[in-house]
Amino acid sequence: MDKFTTLTGIAAPMPLINVDTDMIIPKQFLKTIKRSGLGANLFDEMRFDDDGNEIPDFVLNKPAYRDAQILVAGDNFGCGSSREHAPWALLDFGIRCVIATSFADIFYNNCFKNGILPIVLLQEQVDMLMDDAERGANAVVSVDLESQTITGPDGGTISFEVDAFRKHCLLNGLDDIGLTLEKAPSIKAFEAEAAQARPWV
């Protein structure tokens, strides 16, 4: 998993509430267990019409937001089924941070496990960032995980909270496998000791 330290990029505004995981990545794209390639179908039913043509008015189809790395979203983002493909699709598209007033619990947890930083802010703070994001190509926002601050286009800063353990994992690029590998010496020592104590096992 890639480390998350400081992210500076275009913020795309998506003020819709209750964006569920089926909207993020529709069910017909869940057949794969690969994490790559899902970005092409991120928000598929909002990005494309029935003939597969881009819908020009959708935010991520607009030239200013095609390379967005930050998503400023509405309340209860990521609700619905618990598909891990949802954060996979966001990450594959290039989104490393989602900012909203609230997230569905499972989606929120899955983001951290896949290298995405979900940030919960007050409504007025999200509204301010949403206004900033409306600037298009000028909507450059910086997220500093170490200092837990967001810096807007005008230089104003907003502080955010994040669990200390999850922060540690993101800063060091540690997913569940990485965390286990950190304990490899202790695991090997335990196995060696257990083999001596119970050689019949």
From Swiss-Prot:
Pathway as given in its UniProt record: Amino-acid biosynthesis; L-leucine biosynthesis; L-leucine from 3-methyl-2-oxobutanoate: step 2/4
The reaction(s) catalysed by this protein are: (2R,3S)-3-isopropylmalate = (2S)-2-isopropylmalate
One GO molecular function term of this record is: 3-isopropylmalate dehydratase activity
Query: What SUPFAM superfamilies does its record include?
Result: LeuD/IlvD-like
**EC code:** 4.2.1.33
Question: Would you tell me the Gene Ontology cellular component terms?
Answer: 3-isopropylmalate dehydratase complex
Could you mention a single GO BP entry for this protein?
L-leucine biosynthetic process
Q: What are the protein's UniProt keywords?
A: Amino-acid biosynthesis, Branched-chain amino acid biosynthesis, Leucine biosynthesis, Lyase
Q: Which domain of life is it from?
A: Bacteria
Identify one Pfam family in the record. Answer: Aconitase_C
Q: How does it assemble?
A: Heterodimer of LeuC and LeuD.
**Which protein family is it in?**
Belongs to the LeuD family. LeuD type 1 subfamily.
The family database entries (PANTHER family) matched by this protein are listed as: 3-ISOPROPYLMALATE DEHYDRATASE SMALL SUBUNIT (PTHR43345:SF5), 3-ISOPROPYLMALATE DEHYDRATASE SMALL SUBUNIT 2-RELATED-RELATED (PTHR43345)
Function noted in UniProt: Catalyzes the isomerization between 2-isopropylmalate and 3-isopropylmalate, via the formation of 2-isopropylmaleate.
**Name the record gives this protein:** 3-isopropylmalate dehydratase small subunit
The organism of origin for this protein? Jannaschia sp. (strain CCS1)
Q: What is the lineage of its organism?
A: Bacteria, Pseudomonadati, Pseudomonadota, Alphaproteobacteria, Rhodobacterales
Supply the gene name: leuD
